[in-house]
């Protein structure tokens, strides 16, 4: 067997996954992080930041469809959407499929990610960067939500893991800013890691979000690239009814939106809020914290 170059993910200290590398398309240390894009025979083009896989061509649709269509169809009347992160462009691609949306703002801390992904991962954005409804802001997400006077109907935090530049997007000061930046009836969602291996992330997010939102939960999807089982997405709103929509309502909204998805459908939407018992147990034993330290 011919010797192939192997790339090892470094997210976990004692176990993990590796990828065979057919061709390194791009490698550079940007202003904020180490970025590499390479080709894998099974997963297509793969992007990693600081040693952690962020996205692959093969299965990115699962992640991006669930991060966008669940909150947008649950809301039902979203006009203004804010994406935090999302420099690869796929979240923008999925949001832009909703024709009733009037404005899409994306705040990305690293201009290099946007530039290089447009060149080396063009299928992710699929032309969405040219959508006239789209506005790109190069800024830190925490700074943006705490400085802006705009209000949004849905906020999607397409953050990395809570290390490096992404760490601030798991803090109380960020969640407070997001709550303040939502219109009445608005929804906040965020990636929250693989709950079997990163359960503390979900517990910490739940604890902090509960200070600013009356309904906090998670939904889930299995995404092969993210090693360790199902990925959880944080869900936060002031209206618990948005998490409990019946299947018929979602089917009607899905049909009206005219979406054709590869993973998402209304039944998946309803079922995604069913969580494993070990996570439910962890969330029900969260210690109550008096006061909020905005630096955490």
Swiss-Prot record:
Q: Where in the cell is it found?
A: Cytoplasm
Q: Name one GO cellular component term.
A: cytosol
Q: In which pathway does it act?
A: Amine and polyamine biosynthesis; spermidine biosynthesis; spermidine from putrescine: step 1/1
Is NAD one of the keywords?
no
- Which residues are listed for S-methyl-5'-thioadenosine binding in this entry? 33, 108, 140-141, 165
EC number in record? 2.5.1.16
Active-site residues are 158 (proton acceptor)
Which family does the record assign? Belongs to the spermidine/spermine synthase family.
Q: Which PANTHER family match?
A: SPERMIDINE SYNTHASE, SPERMIDINE/SPERMINE SYNTHASE
Q: What is annotated about its quaternary structure and interactions?
A: Homodimer or homotetramer.
Q: Name one GO biological process term.
A: spermidine biosynthetic process
Per its UniProt record, what InterPro entries does this chain match?
PABS, PABS_CS, SAM-dependent_MTases_sf, Spermi_synthase, Spermidine_synt_N, Spermidine_synt_N_sf
Per UniProt, the keywords (alphabetical) are: Cytoplasm, Polyamine biosynthesis, Spermidine biosynthesis, Transferase
Domain of life here?
Answer: Bacteria
| SUPFAM superfamilies named in the record | S-adenosyl-L-methionine-dependent methyltransferases
UniProt KW Membrane keyword: no
Picking any one GO molecular function of the record gives:
spermidine synthase activity
UniProt-recorded name of the protein = Polyamine aminopropyltransferase
- Positions annotated to bind spermidine: 64, 88, 158-161
Organism of this sequence: Yersinia pestis
